[in-house]
Amino acid sequence: MSERHAALTSLPPILPRLIRRFAVVIVLLWLGFTAFVNLAVPQLEVVGKAHSVSMSPSDAASIQAIKRVGQVFGEFDSDNAVTIVLEGDQPLGGDAHRFYSDLMRKLSADTRHVAHIQDFWGDPLTAAGSQSADDRAAYVVVYLVGNNETEAYDSVHAVRHMVDTTPPPHGVKAYVTGPAALNADQAEAGDKSIAKVTAITSMVIAAMLLVIYRSVITAVLVLIMVGIDLGAIRGFIALLADHNIFSLSTFATNLLVLMAIAASTDYAIFMLGRYHESRYAGEDRETAFYTMFHGTAHVILGSGLTIAGAMYCLSFARLPYFETLGAPIAIGMLVAVLAALTLGPAVLTVGSFFKLFDPKRRMNTRRWRRVGTAIVRWPGPVLAATCLVASIGLLALPSYRTTYDLRKFMPASMPSNVGDAAAGRRFSRARLNPEVLLIETDHDMRNPVDMLVLDKVAKNIYHSPGIEQVKAITRPLGTTIKHTSIPFIISMQGVNSSEQMEFMKDRIDDILVQVAAMNTSIETMHRMYALMGEVIDNTVDMDHLTHDMSDITATLRDHLADFEDFFRPIRSYFYWEKHCFDVPLCWSIRSIFDMFDSVDQLSEKLEYLVKDMDILITLLPQMRAQMPPMISAMTTMRDMMLIWHGTLGAFYKQQERNNKDPGAMGRVFDAAQIDDSFYLPQSAFENPDFKRGLKMFLSPDGKAARFVIALEGDPATPEGISRVEPIKREAREAIKGTPLQGAAIYLGGTAATFKDIREGARYDLLIAGVAAISLILIIMMIITRSVVAAVVIVGTVVLSMGASFGLSVLVWQDILGIELYWMVLAMSVILLLAVGSDYNLLLISRLKEEIGAGLNTGIIRAMAGTGGVVTAAGMVFAVTMSLFVFSDLRIIGQIGTTIGLGLLFDTLVVRSFMTPSIAALLGRWFWWPLRVRPRPASQMLRPFAPRRLVRALLLPSGQHPSATGAHE
């Protein structure tokens, strides 16, 4: 046992002594803490859904542009939208339209989740623009309420519920897809995969631990420690997120879980490896415990601080994709470090009491001693070989291509992917994911002058490379409005004359119809004149008869009056009798007396009739006398109309010969669809259809105009992103020198958003990368107390990072044929910076302990002592991260495999060969500014003063120590 170990045994530091003394209490405290944080709040996935943050960069120009469009048009104030796609087995007919109308009514009524519906298919004016060429599919864009992911997810689920509960007609299916639906499904896929990946990881780690330790009990105890760590980390992060300390995302929860598992397992392997090494060296369990703590605590602390610090540097990022990873994973790693420095030693103490952690087999260090010997013997060739291996990955980097299409990285069975596949069968990707250009000025643009400028903007953009279609007020269906060219307007003047000529010819023919009708009227009036004479004669006879009837009725009335006067007493009896109605004879006689009263009324009416008949026989002759002048006037009108018909007929025949095919020029320009001579007259602004178009493409105050631009190909690609700046440039050039000069130009949409994300990712990667590298360098210098060693660690980490990402490009892109998602680069770089220095740190820390034996011997001993442990830990960490490949979210799988490849490269190449070969080449300069001995000091001189002084005392009198050539 070395003197250092002896001193350690005699007076161990206070922290490990306290941990060993209160080991059971510490274990119980951790169990209680884990139980509390998991019972106090819901599970991490549930809290993540309730406190998720929007993944869209809210301060990006493209997102601001979309929100500005919604504000000026009074439609929406968020950037979340879904696309509802209708697909039929046959062309969509009336049933599909009725289903669509019912669905639109439901969506419009749900103002809690739906902000605005861009209903193009419901308007015949724009229906063709949102319908497939075969009429079997149509789509509508629905803007949702919610600027963060939680509200957006609720809105997506609400829309899906309405679509699912509205029965479509036979042969028609409705799908919900679009950016918001994709993001919601991404979160769902990520959350559902956590449990599956965790279970697979646990089984794989258990198998690896069995292979490493050949002990079921040791493997189970390590898994229990990791499980407690994971439960504490998950619960604590969920507790903080539930109290709004920070927000979460799908990537944060997934990476947090596997990082916690991997780091906790690594730290347990570090401790057990050093404990077993000490036990192999003959130390008792207590001494081995203190040796283990002394040799690994600072490494675990440095590793944890490195990971936590590097991950927290992501908090400086602007993109929520990265910013949401910073605080949760950093805090989780700090909890993992705290658990590793307290719970791990406590469990080791309790387990060692029952001899559970004693090694089952002796460590085989011969292989690693040979590796170390080869390195110190041939450091240059070894370093060259490692650089050659690293170049494999580095050479693959230039071929790196990325993609921004989220659909490819989620299961095809997800609802949004099913809907997107249905839409892709009928529509192009660019048509479903257009760019939106907004031009906002300080005056009303609803006039012919500004319409010319707006059409120029649309024309310039449309004629630029990579543009498939531009929809605007002057081209609502993607092409210029028909009949709006100046040649067509000129041509239509002749067409109008020709059309009017045909109309007038028809009206001339109508004159003949009128003449025929007038002839009929004249003949009818002649017959009426003759019949009127007969009517007058008959009326005179009726008048005489009426006078006679009046006289007879008066005589009848007088005789009946005499009869009634004589029988009045008897009549009174019939009216007084109460039961007269029940006696038929009584009631009939009473009715006869009532009839006598009606004779008086009849006589009176006949007298009135006599007077009217006298008036009638006076008026009828006067009416008959008016008919001959009317017949004469109508005959004259008929003759004049015949003359007018002849005159106009001759005139329009001459005009018809002069205007033959006047619309030829207009038809040619319409067929050619040349938009160089666009003009919209003022009268068009009164057209009802054009007014509907104004509402869609111009703001209510007319001061902002919207353009919907479809790119050629997929906008979520580097090629699509490259079209963004040309669109802005063409718009600025189009308004230069016009009344719209100086107008504000906004551009949003899929390509514009990913352009901002790409630029933001570069900035975030630069900021977070520089901050992480600086932080790691500082931590390494503090722990190693060597500037050169710290620089070597950081340098090899950076080299390993580049090589590992190149290997990931080689595997995913070149071998599997799947391009890496855009965020894989930034996330894997930061994570590799965070975890890549662990094994180098452990190696160099052990090398620092063994340096007293000499530089080369120390390298050999350090390689022998740490080779197996570091390789096991690195393999476990790499496999754990690589198991992300089983996630339903392929993005997570790409990130995990990239980190796994990096850790394998770092473990098997950098730590095993590159770093020790650099240390051997640099010699004592590797430890600068520390002063170290290239060779070990003499055993005889070690307990005494410096070599120069001792030799001065031992040499014969008069001999100077320098004569021996010895130097300290």
Curated annotation (Swiss-Prot):
<dbReference type="InterPro" id="IPR050545">
    <property type="entry name" value="Mycobact_MmpL"/>
</dbReference>
<feature type="transmembrane region" description="Helical">
    <location>
        <begin position="815"/>
        <end position="835"/>
    </location>
</feature>
<protein>
    <recommendedName>
        <fullName>Probable transport protein MmpL2</fullName>
    </recommendedName>
</protein>
<dbReference type="Pfam" id="PF03176">
    <property type="entry name" value="MMPL"/>
</dbReference>
<feature type="transmembrane region" description="Helical">
    <location>
        <begin position="866"/>
        <end position="886"/>
    </location>
</feature>
<feature type="transmembrane region" description="Helical">
    <location>
        <begin position="22"/>
        <end position="42"/>
    </location>
</feature>
<feature type="transmembrane region" description="Helical">
    <location>
        <begin position="245"/>
        <end position="265"/>
    </location>
</feature>
<feature type="transmembrane region" description="Helical">
    <location>
        <begin position="890"/>
        <end position="910"/>
    </location>
</feature>
<feature type="transmembrane region" description="Helical">
    <location>
        <begin position="328"/>
        <end position="348"/>
    </location>
</feature>
<feature type="transmembrane region" description="Helical">
    <location>
        <begin position="787"/>
        <end position="807"/>
    </location>
</feature>
<dbReference type="InterPro" id="IPR004707">
    <property type="entry name" value="MmpL_fam"/>
</dbReference>
<keyword id="KW-1003">Cell membrane</keyword>
<feature type="transmembrane region" description="Helical">
    <location>
        <begin position="297"/>
        <end position="317"/>
    </location>
</feature>
<feature type="transmembrane region" description="Helical">
    <location>
        <begin position="378"/>
        <end position="398"/>
    </location>
</feature>
<keyword id="KW-1133">Transmembrane helix</keyword>
<keyword id="KW-0472">Membrane</keyword>
<keyword id="KW-0813">Transport</keyword>
<keyword id="KW-0812">Transmembrane</keyword>
<feature type="transmembrane region" description="Helical">
    <location>
        <begin position="204"/>
        <end position="224"/>
    </location>
</feature>
<dbReference type="GO" id="GO:0009274">
    <property type="term" value="C:peptidoglycan-based cell wall"/>
</dbReference>
<feature type="transmembrane region" description="Helical">
    <location>
        <begin position="763"/>
        <end position="783"/>
    </location>
</feature>
<dbReference type="GO" id="GO:0005886">
    <property type="term" value="C:plasma membrane"/>
</dbReference>
<comment type="similarity">
    <text>Belongs to the resistance-nodulation-cell division (RND) (TC 2.A.6) family. MmpL subfamily.</text>
</comment>
<dbReference type="InterPro" id="IPR004869">
    <property type="entry name" value="MMPL_dom"/>
</dbReference>
